[in-house]
Amino acid sequence: MPNFLPINTILVPQGAEYKAVCRAFRGVTGSIPTVVAIPVGMKPLLKYLHASPANAQFLAPKSRVLIMGICGSLSDRYKIGDLVLYQDCVYQGKQQECDRTFTAQLHSSVSQKVSLVKALTSDHLIWSAAEKRRLGETLAADVVDMEGFTALEFFNAAGVDVAILRVVSDDCQHNIPDLTPAINDGSLNPLPLAIGMLRQPLAATRLIRGSLTALKVLEQVTNLLFSG
């Protein structure tokens, strides 16, 4: 692990994203950060952060938290599999910035192509390509997620250095399935998820392919950062 950017904790949305990051550490020797699975969505994440038994570790002096995962593109510039590093995150007119020094160090550590972006955090799943393009244009945002702003607001208030590194899993040219009914209290419920996928098979196929591509890149970049 590069000693000049000691990362204490990696937070990753639970499920496939968390598993991809954990796979990246197989065979990695030396000091590795604690990888923590977090709930999906703003409200479940905020509740988790305030109640988590790992709070003492998150908020320790000089601790650094890296948030990883996948995201959706709001711009034609960012394609499936692209690696993005957040500069800041917006939500309903409010803005939270990532730590500039930490972000710059990560940027120089990732030898493969990585783009510095402005992110939007949404309190609901944005499945429509038209809505993605509209949000990208009106808010001048590049990508969208469902956790970034909440995490930044929490850790910035506590004085913890935070950076966010994500991989694009869906573009702004095609709809993805509306899986809103499947998201419940921070997790994906299998039955509504399956029903949502079956109702929109073409969109589901695109989402699965995009997610698999993004998860592979997520695993690769995690291994790259921490394998020395």
Task: Explain the meaning of each model-derived region.
Residues A24, D82-V84, E131, A194-L198:
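Short, basic/glycine-rich phosphate-binding loops at helix/coil junctions
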Residues G72, G81, Q87, D123-H124, ...:
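Flexible, active-site-adjacent loop/turn segments at secondary-structure boundaries
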Residues C22, H50, H107, F149-L152, ...:
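Predominant activation on well-ordered alpha-helical scaffold segments within soluble catalytic domains
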Residues R100-Q173, P177-P181:
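Active-site rim beta-loop-alpha module in soluble metabolic enzymes
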Residues M1-S111, A119, D142, A157:
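Metabolite-binding pocket within alpha/beta catalytic cores that recognizes anionic/polar moieties
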Residues A16, V40, P44, E97, ...:
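Conserved active-site and cofactor/substrate-binding residues in soluble primary-metabolism enzymes
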Residues Y48-N55, Q105-K113, L125-I126, A158-I164, ...:
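Noncatalytic linker/hinge segments flanking ATPase motor cores
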Residues V168-G228:
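Regulatory input/activation interfaces that engage signals or partners
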